[in-house]
Each structure stands twice: as C-alpha cells, then as structure tokens.
C-alpha cells in the first residue's frame, strides 16, 4: 500500500537525512552512471538518475542527439519500472513522503511522475514574500499572477531585479513619510 498522509492536522514526516545514502544503496548496480541525486522536501522525494548517453556518429545533428537521449530515457523507464516501483514503496514507507523518479541523459532530462499539489500550499515563506513584493509593488494583482510572472521571468538576473525593486519600494515609502500630512 502506498503512503498516504493522514487527513486533518499536518504532522511532520520523519527526518530524511540519510535518504540519499539509503536510496543509493537500494538502486541496483548498472542502472545509473553515477549515484542518484536525491531532492527531499516535506512532501516529496525526487530521485534523479543519470543514464549513459547514446553514442552517435560525428554526422549526427542536435535533433538526432536529442531523439537518441529521449529514446534512452524511455527505454530506462520501461526496463526499470517494476524495480523503481518497489524502491519507491520502500522509500515511501521509510520516510513517509511520496516518491518521484527523474532521469537525465546528456542534455535531456525527464521527470516521470511527481506530486501535484496546489501551488500556494507548497510555497515556503521566502517564496511567498517574493510574490507579496510583486503584488505590493503593483507588478501583479495577486499571488497567482505574480507566480505566473515569475515563471516567465526566471533567469540569472531575477534576484538582482527583486533587490532593486525592494530598494525602490523602500525609497517610495520614505518619500510618502516625508510628504505632507493628510
């Protein structure tokens, strides 16, 4: 039976500090080219594995390489399905979190199945503060709109831009305080 969190009051799952080591030991030799990368949060454990990149001739195009990598990922998914399910059930029982699998091959990656939950329930306080900053600054009308905006804007300069926006808002607040009394 798959793990299902109890309804009602939220309880913290057990610590998963050793999850990466446990999962590395549970994954059969030969499945992956390196130890799996394990990402843990309160709700889910994602196991990322890297599979060998297919060898193609020198004349192959980027499209050929992409197709070969997608094919390798698909084959891994099919060949290891029963074993991955068995490991996932053990991990879910041990750590009381849902388990998802993802595979990387060359430049291609695919997350097979993953926990789907309402976005706002999964955000931590720092993420909500980013959304609130965008709403307060008038960039978005709601947290949902701010989240959609963030997804479109994600890039290397996002943090710099948010810092500048917060500084500008601080300056606006200072100017409001200096203004005439109402």
Describe the role of every protein-language-model region:
Residues 143-162:
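Short, basic amphipathic alpha-helical segments that act as recognition/interaction helices
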């Amino acid at each position: 039976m798959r793990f299902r969190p109890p309804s009602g009051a939220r309880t913290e799952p057990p610590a998963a500090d050793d999850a990466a080591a446990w999962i590395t030991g549970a994954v059969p030799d030969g499945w992956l080219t390196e130890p799996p990368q394990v990402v843990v949060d309160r709700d889910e454990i994602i196991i990322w594995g890297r599979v060998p990149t297919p060898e193609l001739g020198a004349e192959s195009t980027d499209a050929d390489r992409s197709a070969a990598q997608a094919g390798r990922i698909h084959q891994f998914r099919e060949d290891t399905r029963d074993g991955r399910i068995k490991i996932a059930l053990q991990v879910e029982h041990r750590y009381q979190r849902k388990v998802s699998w993802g595979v990387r091959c060359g430049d291609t990656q695919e997350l097979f199945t993953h926990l789907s939950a309402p976005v706002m329930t999964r955000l931590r306080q720092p993420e909500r503060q980013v959304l609130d900053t965008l709403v307060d600054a008038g960039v978005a009308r709601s947290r949902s709109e701010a989240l959609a905006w963030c997804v479109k804007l994600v890039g290397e300069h996002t943090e710099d831009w948010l810092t500048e926006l917060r500084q500008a808002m601080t300056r606006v607040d200072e100017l409001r305080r200096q203004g005439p009394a109402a």
